[in-house]
Amino acid sequence: MADETNRNVNEQPQAQDMGELLRIRRDKLKVLQEEGRDPFTITRFDVTHHTQDIKDNFDAMEGQAVSVAGRLMSKRGMGKVSFCDLQDKTGRIQIYARKDEMDEDNYNHFKKYDIGDIVGVKGEVFRTQRGEMSVRAHDITLLSKSLRPLPEKFHGLTDKEIRYRQRYVDLIMNPESKRNFEIRSQFVAFLRRYLDGLGFMEVETPVLSPIAGGANARPFITHHNAQDIDMYMRIATELHLKRLIVGGLERVYEVGRIFRNEGMDTKHNPEFTTCELYQAYTNLDGMMDILEGILTGAAKEILGTYHVQWLGHDIDLTPSWQRVTMADVVKNVTGADFMACIGDADKGVELAKSVGVDMDGVAHTWGNALYETFDQKVEETLIQPTFITMYPVEVSPLAKRSPTQPELTERYEMFICGCEMGNAFSELNDPIDQYERFKAQAAKRANGDEEADMMDEDFVMALEYGMPPTGGLGFGIDRCAMMLCGTDSIRDVILFPTMKPLDN
């Protein structure tokens, strides 16, 4: 039988050899089982330390007995002395195995183990003559047999697809990928601590609902067999959370999955994670303070700096961030002064077209003209953290109108590198106004706009009981993780992104 025991992890098995390599490993497993050493019958191995613990505390631990476990990533030598690299969740450490310091059978069995096998090692901490921090093995136990060889590494577009489809292999082979998900996890943990510290209460709201509301998006539809009704996967958590503000909870937030039946690109996945929060007795300014506090605090705690490299730019998260109205930033970038013709649809549309904005397929209103000019000409120029405020009412059906300029709303979106990172309102709490806006959205939906809001009469009824002045904020966990990790694709921060099934 051919032997791949000494194959270094840096050797890439050729496609034509894969069948043979799989057969070899299955044959090895069969021999183990026949000898009564089936690794899959083992249920426990007591680990005393992780590899990074040993490295961080080496001076204090030298000579100390330890038990470590992990995956074999390389093997070197096979005479009386062998070396291997063991990888656990914290990193790698060298294992030093010497025949005359181990049970002879144990050492001979170890020689037959393969790259990718999972082992438990008992030994003592020491440094080799070359100065390598290591564990001197006294006993090595095979805990799980790897029946499929590990690849060398991932590279190129084709291999990037494999990374997303086989994340389990990506995490084994690429420390930077695992680091991305550690940063994401740390960000969510920081977020919860931050909001809990402000007196917010974490809640859970329905994922399935008879009405899809709270955002302009196309929902996924499913069917509830017992009740024989169609239901929607939620496109936002907003309307349920605001019901809780009506109920008197005052400060609530939810970190949860959102589902939108829309296109996919480097910034969008149909299944993604958001945080939405609502606070009674505050407004848009309070929501700006919270989002800025979350992102600056997370960067400082997780990365140790306010400066991050993202999408080719050096992003400075140092407080305080720029705050500017949509009309002002449009004027600054394009020269188009929409406030000079506020409320005049014809002049607004003419102004938008004069700076090259495409208004086809968009209702010709002043507010839409302003928004389309911002969307098409300005958004991509917003590199450093910037709050854009005072959105047109046409694109903000759930935000409170400006008391001095009713064509505009007390809403902001925050942008970094041209990406929308957060969306917040001084929440609309007038049930009569809300009902009229729902009617306008329903009319759009009746005319074929599948992303327009549905009428939600129960939500209007909740507002009729009275909702205090409230600030609301929603932001994507995935995009925040992208920024903190410095990645250019949302798939790099979602463990199992949506992928088109392979033909076979």
Regions found by a protein language model. Give the residues of each.
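Metal-assisted phosphate- and nucleotidyl-transfer catalytic regions
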Residues: 213-219, 297-416, 440-467
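Short acidic-glycine loop/turn motifs at beta-strand connectors
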Residues: 89, 129, 333, 416-418
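Conserved hydrophobic/aromatic pocket- or pore-lining residues that grip, position, or stack substrates
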Residues: 140, 195, 199, 329, ...
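A short, flexible low-complexity segment enriched in Lys/Arg and Gly/Pro that occurs
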Residues: 2-18, 44, 224-227, 398-402, ...
